Amino acid sequence: MEMLESKPLSAISMVIDSIGVDHENQNKCNCCNEQIYDRYIYRMDNRSYHENCVKCTICESPLAEKCFWKNGRIYCSQHYYKDHSIHRCAGCKKGVSPTDMVYKLKAGLVFHVECHCCSLCGRHLSPGEQILVDDTMMTVSCMSHYPPQMDDNAPGAIGSAVDIPSCSTENPIAPYPIDESFSSAFQVKKEVDAYGYNFEHYSFSDFCDDDSRMLKRRGPRTTIKQNQLDVLNEMFSNTPKPSKHARAKLALETGLSMRVIQVWFQNRRSKERRLKHLCNYLRHYEQRGLIPPPIHFRNEEMDTTDFNAFCGNFEEEDDED
């Protein structure tokens, strides 16, 4: 934008250049369509404007020092980038100004700070927080919505979502009991966190073997006393899979039936395997400097600080042999 000064006496060169030019139309304001007699003239794209007519088309604020021109319309800096910026906020779908504070994800999405919210619950997402990115819909959501809820009537659907457990390097990791009714329907999925570093999001089914499939209850629950549990734990530490003869000796020593002892060892071996998978799963996050989200179970919460107490209550199941 240039500002011209109309002087009473013009130079000879300007007079020569002005020959054949329609001064009446040249000095007509492009905004109000009135003739300009002011001392100063604003000129943009070979169009003249009154000083007072140079205003933002949107907010009508006067633009004395700087303005933007697009398709015959004048804008202030804020509204020009809001309507015509090549970078668009994935949240509000409006343009991004060079002075705006934004979050830029590795997936190519850009969000205003105030627009960086979960698309499902509307919660504001903080810097460094792990998020789920949908490249197709260009949305983000918080980890509490993973895995997504599925229709109970759909084939292979799961009744409710199971979240991923959290871990801390300051406190020891307590063994988590894994719900045996959890189906292995989820697959490994890659996501991107708030800083754009790739990490693989695993569900529990990726770490469980065939023994984690849902088993049907067929007998009453049996509670083992502490002295009986101590004998079984001692045997398990020496022989995780005792023979039939060893189980018969345990039945005489503890007063429990061979059926109960056999089921207890089956369940204990299964818990040990899943505990090993769970530790590998948590180590997978810690090696990458990531913190998994908290875990919740569909069934009633159980005390995970005492693994022996957890193994004291179990269900009688069919023989594997």
Curated annotation (Swiss-Prot):
Domain of life: Eukaryota
DNA-binding region ranges: 217-276
Predominant subcellular localization, coarse grouping: nucleus
Stored CDD domains: homeodomain
Cellular component terms per the entry's GO annotation: nucleus; RNA polymerase II transcription regulator complex
InterPro entries (alphabetical): HD (IPR001356), Homeobox_CS (IPR017970), Homeodomain-like_sf (IPR009057), LIM_Homeobox_TF (IPR050453), Znf_LIM (IPR001781)
PROSITE patterns referenced in this protein's UniProt entry, alphabetically: HOMEOBOX_1, HOMEOBOX_2, LIM_DOMAIN_1, LIM_DOMAIN_2
Domain LIM zinc-binding span(s) in chain numbering: 27-86, 87-152
Keyword terms, alphabetized: Developmental protein, DNA-binding, Homeobox, LIM domain, Metal-binding, Nucleus, Repeat, Transcription, Transcription regulation, Zinc
Gene Ontology molecular function: DNA-binding transcription factor activity, RNA polymerase II-specific; metal ion binding; RNA polymerase II transcription regulatory region sequence-specific DNA binding; RNA polymerase II-specific DNA-binding transcription factor binding; transcription coactivator activity
SUPFAM superfamilies (alphabetical): Glucocorticoid receptor-like (DNA-binding domain), Homeodomain-like
Tissue: Expressed in the mechanosensory neurons ALML, ALMR, PLML, PLMR, AVM and PVM, and the FLPL and FLPR neurons.
UniProt-annotated location(s): Nucleus
GO biological process entries: mechanosensory behavior; neuron differentiation; neuron projection organization; positive regulation of transcription by RNA polymerase II; regulation of DNA-templated transcription; regulation of transcription by RNA polymerase II; response to mechanical stimulus
A Pfam family: LIM
PANTHER family in the record: LIM/HOMEOBOX PROTEIN LHX (PTHR24208), MECHANOSENSORY PROTEIN 3 (PTHR24208:SF170)
Role this protein plays: Transcription factor. Specifies differentiation of the set of six touch receptor neurons (TRNs). May positively modulate expression of both its own gene and also of homeobox ARX homolog alr-1 in TRNs, forming a positive feedback loop with alr-1, thereby restricting the variability of expression of mec-3. Required to determine the identity of ALM sensory neurons, acting by interacting with unc-86, thereby preventing unc-86 cooperating with pag-3 to induce BDU-neuron specific genes. Binds cooperatively as a heterodimer with unc-86 to sites in the mec-3 gene promoter.
Subunit: Interacts with unc-86; the heterooligomer binds to the promoters of mec-3, mec-4 and mec-7.
Protein name per UniProt: Mechanosensory protein 3
